[in-house]
A protein has these predicted regions:
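Polytopic membrane enzymes that build or remodel cell-surface glycoconjugates and lipids
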Residues: 1-189
Length: 189
């Protein structure tokens, strides 16, 4: 099913395409789409799959630096954090094992969502484009791996601890409700 881009729509509603085990069916259509495009570009040439994994990992490392710049002062601490992320042996699995692409794709969209949300919150005026991008990236993270649901408590924690004070609990709930609903639809669906 990965050998034809015509199967891509089915990746979004057939859970048996990612996992053949009926008890542990995982929903990761974005990963399947990336594999299908990889196959379409270079068939089964393993090197191309590794190049894609390395490219996604490089983007993730840059996003770690960008997130670090939000919370750490100076240039060096975020840069060191990004380099540790890029070079740490624990992350080599994500680059080396083609089947681990779900982690890196999830991280790519998770970090993008968090970054857009943080920039939207730090803007003087509420930024609808940034919040919309954050929600779309969150959906992408969920379509990559289920661990992305942890973005919701992370945003709640950051609202409480780092971002400018929220005027009321009602405002906080209003801001986080779309993220909670996306996570709920993913978990229940």
């Amino acid at each position: 099913h990965l050998r034809s881009v015509e199967n891509i729509p089915q990746f979004f509603y057939r859970t048996d395409f990612f996992s053949a085990d009926p008890r542990g069916r995982m929903y990761r259509p974005l990963v399947l789409v990336s594999y299908a495009f990889n196959y379409g570009l270079d068939k089964l040439q393993v090197e191309s799959y590794h190049w894609v994994n390395m490219g996604v990992h490089a983007l993730n490392s840059a996003l770690v630096i960008a997130v670090g710049r939000l919370f750490l002062s100076g240039l060096w601490p975020p840069l060191v954090a990004g380099l540790i992320f890029a070079l740490h042996p624990i992350n080599s699995e994500v680059v080396n094992y083609i089947s681990s692409r779900s982690e890196s794709l999830c991280a790519l969209f998770f970090l993008t969502s968090f970054l857009c949300y943080a920039y939207a919150r730090r803007a003087e005026r509420w930024s609808v484009p940034l919040m919309g991008t954050s929600l779309l990236a969150f959906a992408g993270a969920l379509l990559g791996k289920s661990v992305a649901v942890t973005l919701v408590p992370l945003l709640f924690f950051c609202e409480w601890r780092f971002f400018s004070p929220v005027s009321s609990l009602r405002t906080l709930i209003k801001r986080l409700t779309p993220f909670f609903l996306f996570a709920l639809v993913y978990v229940v669906g």
